[in-house]
Amino acid sequence: MGVLCFGASNILLCAEDSSSVLGLGGFGGGGGEVAAELGCGGGGGFDFFGFGGGAVFPIDSDEFVALLVEKEMDHQPQRGYLEKLELGGLECSWRKDAIDWICKVHSYYNFGPLSLYLAVNYLDRFLSSFNLPHDESWMQQLLSVSCLSLATKMEETVVPLPMDLQVFDAEYVFEARHIKRMELIVMKTLKWRLQAVTPFSFIGYFLDKFNEGKPPSYTLASWCSDLTVGTLKDSRFLSFRPSEIAAAVVLAVLAENQFLVFNSALGESEIPVNKEMVMRCYELMVEKALVKKIRNSNASSSVPHSPITVLDAACFSFRSDDTTLGSSQSNSNNKDYNSQDSAPASKRRRLNTTPI
């Protein structure tokens, strides 16, 4: 492919931390002290993927998690969005096509699981807030590229050039300036809240609570990551808060590995989430057989899979064989394109005029 950008020289590379989610920064330096008192980030966590920058499950204090729960809905789609998706309108088709494409590119570059989750989060929040044009088919592809580009800039240490993200059935080829303009539109629509609260913000906390403070194994952390990204495609999971999804994920994984009984553990716990919604989320996971898919996937191979394995088969053929789950390193030496999967740029439509 093309040249990869190392370092932070690329435009719009973001440097937010968890304190920025709660607005704890930017107050004469005092924000960092407040965040430290609350147990915000940097206070330890489970790093199973060896990289950090989205690969760590932080163990935050009860007070800080309570603040995250209070703020998490600020990073969710607008009200009424799920109903629009259920009606099968334009938002539904855009979402499906965009997630399918994002999954393929995410797996191709072997990005981390949080990058995938953030890209879909940006997509959903944008679609819920923006009036979509019916006669601008190119915009759906440009939006997909921009959301994934922003997510990788937030979480990855090796960030491909925007042009290099445009692979796998890309009908149009957008110039970097068009992608950057769309990124600005997305960020403005999202009110510049890119360091979103996601289920990954809570998984370390719930693992610590439900696993009696014992560090979980690589397998448990891997399953939690897989199950979390496995909820992305089904829009019904949008009815749950990130904290509720995280609690359901951790309990489901621990129950599957016979560390606890789901119902009793949930009932006896003192966690700052709606237990009824956690149970409903778990029941939807069972209905979708997500845990079963993860178990079968892990049983079929001794090599840890990418989190993408719990998504549909359309993504499977593009999965990396890297032994590190959620690795953010791009195996640039192994990027030989399959002519059936990625058409040459010369055969795809290039927008010479400014689309936005």
From Swiss-Prot:
Gene Ontology molecular-function annotations: cyclin-dependent protein serine/threonine kinase regulator activity
* InterPro entries for this protein: Cyclin (IPR039361), Cyclin-like_dom (IPR013763), Cyclin-like_sf (IPR036915), Cyclin_C-dom (IPR004367), Cyclin_N (IPR006671), Cyclins_cyclin-box (IPR048258)
Keyword match Cell membrane? no
Pfam families found in the cross-reference section:
Cyclin_C (PF02984), Cyclin_N (PF00134)
Q: Where is the composition biased (Polar residues)?
A: 325-343
Q: Where is the composition biased (Basic residues)?
A: 346-356
Q: Does the keyword Acetylation apply?
A: no
The UniProt entry, under SMART domains, shows: CYCLIN, Cyclin_C
Disordered: annotated span: 325-356
One GO term of the biological process aspect: G1/S transition of mitotic cell cycle
**Entry keywords, A to Z:** Cell cycle, Cell division, Cyclin
Which GO cellular component terms are attached? cyclin-dependent protein kinase holoenzyme complex; cytoplasm; nucleus
PANTHER family documented for this protein = CYCLINS
Please report which protein family the annotation says this sequence is part of.
Answer: Belongs to the cyclin family. Cyclin D subfamily.
Q: What protein is this chain from?
A: Cyclin-D2-2
- Highest classification ranks of the organism: Eukaryota, Viridiplantae, Streptophyta, Embryophyta, Tracheophyta
